[in-house]
Amino acid sequence: MRLFIPMVVFSFLLSQNIWNGVSVATPDNLDAISSNPAGLGIDRGEQSGTYLSFDSKYTNSSSFRSNGFGYDLTYNIHSHGLFNPEDGNIGVGFSPVRNFYTGIKWNKHSFIDLGFLYRPFNFISIGSAHKFSDDFEQYEYSTYGVAIRPLFNHRLTIGADYNDMDSGVLTY
């Protein structure tokens, strides 16, 4: 009983971050759609997931990815119909050269994310994701990340991200 409350609190905290991974340097699974679209280029087979949040808006999120393509949709009480989700993303990713991945994602709210991921070895990943308006007139922000696996397997990954929030109009 002594450990029950800390375990419930810990599991509750983990469940608040539905698909998001540790870092933009580790977008291996469904989190590739939300964090770094370059992760869609990593072959993980077909994956799908649904998350029901018991919040005041009755949020329902579902994601799918396969063969470099992925999407996620979020519905809640403010959504009006099947073809009008509250939020939606669709993206593609691929590997132009060995151990380097790139991807692009479009968001329903008129944003484009460009993502890059480099894994020279299985124990280190370097990634970045950059958000723009879908006409590329407005730069929103960039996130740069690095992650290492000190035990040389997937059981422990340590990652850190740097967010560059310097928004502004792009000049050419």
Where are these regions (language model features)?
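Positively charged n-region of N-terminal signal peptides that target proteins for export
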Residues: 1-4, 96
